[in-house]
Amino acid sequence: MKFVEIRDLQVTYMGKTKPSIVIDKLDIEEGESVLITGRSGSGKSTLVSVINGVIPHLINAEVKGEVRVFGLDIKTTPTSEISRYVGTLLQDPDTQAFNYTVIDEVAFGVENYMVSREEMINRVEESMKICGISHLRDREINTLSGGELQRTVLASVLAMRPKALILDEPTSNIDPQGTREILELVKTFRSEGISLVLVEHKIERVLPFIDRIIVVESGKIAVDIKKDEIIDRADLLHSLGLEIPDYMLFLKKSGFRRIDYEYLRKTYNYKPPSRNEGKGEILFASVKVKTKSGKYLINTKISLKQGTITALMGKNGSGKTTLLKAIVGLIDKKRLIVEEEKVIVNGKDLSKAKLVERGKYLAYLPQFFDVMFIKRTVEDEVKFSMKNRGVYDEMRLGEILRIFSLDAYRTEDPLVLSMGQRRRVAMASVIAGGAKVILMDEPTSGQDWYHRQILGKELLELRNKGYTILVVTHDARFVDRFTDYLLVMSDGKIVLEGKPEEVFSKSLNHGIEPPLEYELGGLIKNEQFS
């Protein structure tokens, strides 16, 4: 039996006249592992929403053609039945968690199946162990980091024992160590015959764990190849906006049809880009935040140079998001104790300043940014940010929308856009506010390589105009290409700092993997790909 059978599919969202996806034929065999990739907004999420029955049952859209999942017609089969066969990990785990504690969340789906208590306990314990969250069992959901939350949601899906899994950007909010663990789980699922659909922008990460690559472009399947054909098709995939590492293009030009790491280590040279030194300190913060039980979540100092882009990396739960929230004044003081929160921006002491006052100097883009949207159109969202800070200008509004490729979406509701598009709306709104120091929590998450490059280039432009930017990210290649300095956090403290190439030479001990180009080019030693 096939996992997925699609014939003559057209999906048109309510209020739209043009189909979002048009697919003549697509088959996925039971037990097959398939990567679905493509630019942000290309139709990937729509396709998987059809496969798991979310469309048309939960999202109102017209579905023409035939779609069968393990022989079930998705048009007539309720999602409650489809979910017994197909489990889904959504791109934003925050939208998938409903319970108070981790163990309650993992048990929730199984409880709805009314299995025996003994069976439920076994499934929950096994799923938490697989996902490495057993130690979080009694933690409140709202205290988890993004990666911890993602593993919790995945455990809740696994506990339902589906025949197939759809993982929508499963590594987007997880640190490199967590990514390896999740992909090892994928390897385990494959060995057990579970059918897999991975939606992922970063092909390099998942290549060892898949059989096939499907590229969606403008709502259609543009490429459908076996994974061994990736070098042969490297130029085409690159032209479609996919992240094809430089060493793969090098192999293509050298006449290779397969990845040969031994050849690369002998012949491939890599030189990191030049960095900006900066013009002196613009931000200094000394922060101490602890739980009511006395455990320090943050106990560190941070300094940023004016006119630089600094990356902040570290394992999930190391304190990166908490540090940013402390700097901008967003710590929940009913839940946590702020022992010290000294913040100086451009010589002005903001330590006792309220949120609105800090907002004149500091702009903040949160990790889960949908909570920022309060207007019904993209244009009004960005305009509101400008007016709220007293910097509204019509020409500047148009410029910002063009910078972030949002001009065509002026009248769209931000919440109906793809995740990557919504993130660009949030970034445009943050930058439009006028502050000269910008703190971004995972702005690369969920973005395709094309838009990550655009983001990086625009951050460079902002840097060259005098802005100072701090970016929390797990994307080492983005850090290498677009940032000037790199900070690494561990257990609430900054433990490494310097230029990316300096820090990458020491970062493996802290769970930070440099881009593979560093190892292949002889800049560092890493046995992972030997």
UniProtKB/Swiss-Prot annotation:
Q: Note the topology in the membrane.
A: Peripheral membrane protein
Q: Which CDD domains match?
A: ABC_cobalt_CbiO_domain1 (cd03225)
Annotated ranges, domain ABC transporter: 6-243, 282-516
Residues that bind ATP 1: 38-45
Which UniProt key words apply to this protein? ATP-binding, Cell membrane, Membrane, Nucleotide-binding, Repeat, Translocase, Transport
- The positions annotated for binding ATP 2 are 314-321
Give this protein's Gene Ontology molecular function annotations.
Answer: ATP binding; ATP hydrolysis activity; transmembrane transporter activity
Please provide the Gene Ontology terms (biological process) for this protein.
transmembrane transport
Is Cell membrane among the key words of this record?
yes
- Where is the major localization of this protein? membrane
Subcellular localization(s) per the UniProt record: Cell membrane
**Can you supply one Gene Ontology CC term for this chain's record?**
plasma membrane
This entry's Enzyme Commission designation comes to 7.-.-.-
* Role summary: Probably part of an ABC transporter complex. Responsible for energy coupling to the transport system.
Family designation = Belongs to the ABC transporter superfamily.
Can you say what this protein is called? Putative ABC transporter ATP-binding protein SSO1893
